[in-house]
Amino acid sequence: MSTNNSDIRVVVGMSGGVDSSVTAHILKEQGYDVIGIFMKNWDDTDEFGVCTATEDYDDVIRVANQIGIPYYAVNFEKEYWDKVFTYFLEEYKLGRTPNPDVMCNKEIKFKAFLEHAESLGADYVATGHYAQVKKIGDEIELLRGVDNNKDQTYFLNQLSQDQLKKVMFPLGGMEKTEVREIATKAGLATANKKDSTGICFIGERNFKQFLSEYLPAQPGEMRTLDGEVLGKHDGLMYYTIGQRHGLGIGGDGEPWFVVGKDLKANVLFVEQGFHHESLYSDSLIATDISFTTNAEKPKTFECTAKFRYRQTDTKVTVHLRSDGTAEVVFADPVRAITPGQAVVFYDGDICLGGGTIDTVWKNEAKLDYVG
């Protein structure tokens, strides 16, 4: 049932998955002038020598032909390497745990891809993200997707007004089950394709093995904060704050967890117990602060925040500092705050923006062992 949208061109980022397939299908049904673009961001083959990107592009072709839209593949490998993968490696060198999805959305999907789409005459770009945009006056608000389990605003926190004004998220008002139902009803080739998980350029491969191809591993000591040596680690880059698995520490009592790293001494700090006090902090300093609206922000404001994907919101007070960083003070102590990850601010369902966790604090003292 077409409406009068035929003079509005929407370029859809199609990954070969069910979400972007349904996105393209919905927009086509609504009468838009739809073009599908497959972004080739990584030159990759799996352990069987099969290029997973080729398989995904084949699915894009099948779906595009089914719904009757033109499609193209565009190579963003250089941009992805320069803007996302280089950043990913640099963060790991610093002992941090980066979030490449945030950078990919900021630099590739809603920058390089958006610019390419505009060269094709696009009025908007659309993706299969579970998020919503809403026009309020001259501003576009970024809102959580209605499916709490799939909401992806955490990864979109760095988008600007200029980017949001050009974006459509047709799946934002739906549950994942509805999306699958639409795909099945429409007979789309990707209706039963399983969702991709993990970091796109690692895919199904072993994370340690992948990282060691780019960064040399430097094994070292595993110690408690009091200095007791408990074993060896395989390389600091393989561990993240709060991690339990892969430590290889036996014995009685509660499990052991990563609580910090000393990059200079190449030491991994571990402590026993999920709720060990060294895992908790009450504030952080964040860099790369970005807001989704242009509205003037007070120097201090209260909101809620997420410190990792799918985490429950925490009440916080944000103090914007003159050097462009922000101090984020938690209403209650939070476990396993991890440098390199995103801190994302919310006002109800509105995603206000966010930044990158830089340092972690407790009782107004920096926790040097965290990083």
Swiss-Prot record:
GO terms for cellular component: cytoplasm. It catalyses: S-sulfanyl-L-cysteinyl-[protein] + uridine(34) in tRNA + AH2 + ATP = 2-thiouridine(34) in tRNA + L-cysteinyl-[protein] + A + AMP + diphosphate + H(+). It comes from Listeria welshimeri serovar 6b (strain ATCC 35897 / DSM 20650 / CCUG 15529 / CIP 8149 / NCTC 11857 / SLCC 5334 / V8). The keyword RNA-binding applies. It is found in: Cytoplasm. The record marks 129, 341 as: Interaction with tRNA. Disulfide bonds join 104-200. Keywords: ATP-binding, Cytoplasm, Disulfide bond, Nucleotide-binding, RNA-binding, Transferase, tRNA processing, tRNA-binding. HAMAP family: tRNA_thiouridyl_MnmA. The keyword tRNA processing applies. InterPro entries: MnmA-like, MnmA-like_C, MnmA-like_central, MnmA-like_central_sf, Rossmann-like_a/b/a_fold. This is tRNA-specific 2-thiouridylase MnmA.
